[in-house]
Amino acid sequence: GWYTLATNVASTMGVQIEQTMEFNCGGQSGENPSGFVAAYYCQMPDRSQRNVVHILTTHPDWTQTARSPWLVDMVKHELSHRSIMISCGTTQPTIAADRTEAVTNSYSVLFFGADRDRITNQQQGVAEYAMDASSDQLATAIHDGNCG
């Protein structure tokens, strides 16, 4: 199924998927912004979470997501946060400015083969995640080693 595929995609990069019931990075639970977050990546100074992608099983759409290709796109987005962090030392490089999530989406499409149309459809109306030519250019620059 899709969950197995998502797990396999992550494991090719040495990353494991961890299912969790609350939004929590290293003991610091945080607010799940408007219940929107279904998966997340923790940027921890001690690298303890470097190879983990978290999936929130308490998200209202989890049951549906777990049975759809959208799950694989979500995981590719989180893997893109990880790749950007490894390249730039942060998930929010200067070059991305206030477009971190859009740039991360572009990165996942351009370098992990995530489905642009499915992402756009799933995240309709969430402006900070909306990709365009500019976010594609920024993602390519980051991939080429320019973090700003």
Task: Show which residues each predicted segment covers.
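Stable alpha-helical elements in mature extracytoplasmic
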Residues: 2-5, 71-75, 79, 100-103, ...
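Exposed regions on extracellular, virion, or secretory-pathway luminal proteins
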Residues: 9-11, 45-50, 65, 116-125, ...
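Solvent-exposed, acidic/flexible segments
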Residues: 64-76, 93-101, 131, 135
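Long, well-structured alpha-helical subdomains associated
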Residues: 114-148
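Active-site scaffold of zinc-dependent metalloenzymes
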Residues: 29-70, 79-86
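Catalytic Zn2+-binding segment of zinc metalloproteases
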Residues: 79-99, 103, 110-116
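Surface-exposed patches in mature extracellular/periplasmic domains of secreted proteins
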Residues: 15-22, 91-97, 115-126
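A metal-dependent hydrolase signature that marks the N-terminal structural subdomain at the beginning
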Residues: 1-36, 41, 146
